Amino acid sequence: SGVWTGAMALTEGNAGSDLGLLKTTAVPRPDGSWTVTGSKIFISSGDHDMAENVIHLVLARIPDAPAGTKGISLFLCPKVLVNDDGSLGARNAISVGALEHKMGIHAQPTCVMNYDGCQGWMVGEPNRGLAAMFTMMNAERLFVGVQGLGVADASGQTALAYARERLQGRVPGRSGTVPIIAHADVRRTLLSMQSFIEAARAMVVHTALEMDREKFHPDAAVRQRAGENVALLTPVIKAALTDFGFEATVAGQQVLGGHGYIREWGQEQYVRDARIA
């Protein structure tokens, strides 16, 4: 419903792609909840006033946990604690340490989050936090791929509109100055962008349908086959659509020449926003 939102708290200053190095800890409380203590960085939508509560999914270590990724557990830590009747209660011991000043995606608050002995509840089994967190990863991979596709499409639409309006140069067989879309290399650039965009959109729709089949189809064999396809396609989508999406976005900027480098047309923002994906 959007009344509450969520944040995934994995990365730490010393633990990026190697999450086995994370130092955030969780110790049990008598009531069955946990006290979570540590600091995380690069937390997308870690805090904001667009929802009445933010639910943090935090990776942490419990006492006597094995070293490395095999000793990581997952905890649900709400920004605002919830009373027994479902109403919002006291503020949890979660605070923003800093806001990251980013190259792009300025509309999204990316935060350093401090968990100062906050109250949390374990999700799943002890020391199985990564497995629990990765149940969301296929959907997240698809969403990131769509991010690359969407920005490339926006850049392509702007480039096409500009190429139809911008009068520059001449071509054989036509008199007077022509729109730059009449030049072969500009058309090649626009068509290359559109080829990627249409193929990527088809790949996204196919994979999204497979995700629905994996979850909802009544036939177990169909669900299993769809799940195998999803496991294969989602990493490809995340990698390919973001890389090619950035290249297409830059190509759209190039169509505008110098105008693509200034803010008036918006292409420079698309390039900055596409880079994060």
Q: Which residues does each PLM region occupy?
A:
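Glycine-rich phosphate/cofactor-binding loops in nucleotide/flavin-utilizing enzymes
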Residues: H259-A277
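A short core secondary-structure module
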Residues: S33, T37-R91
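Internal maturation/activation junctions in enzymes
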Residues: S1-T24, P28-R29, A208-R223, G227, ...
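Active-site-adjacent bridging/hinge elements
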Residues: S33-V36, W121-F134, R164-I180, A208, ...
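A glycine-rich, basic-preceded beta-loop-alpha segment at the flavin cofactor/substrate interface
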Residues: F42, L81-G97, K102, P109-E140, ...
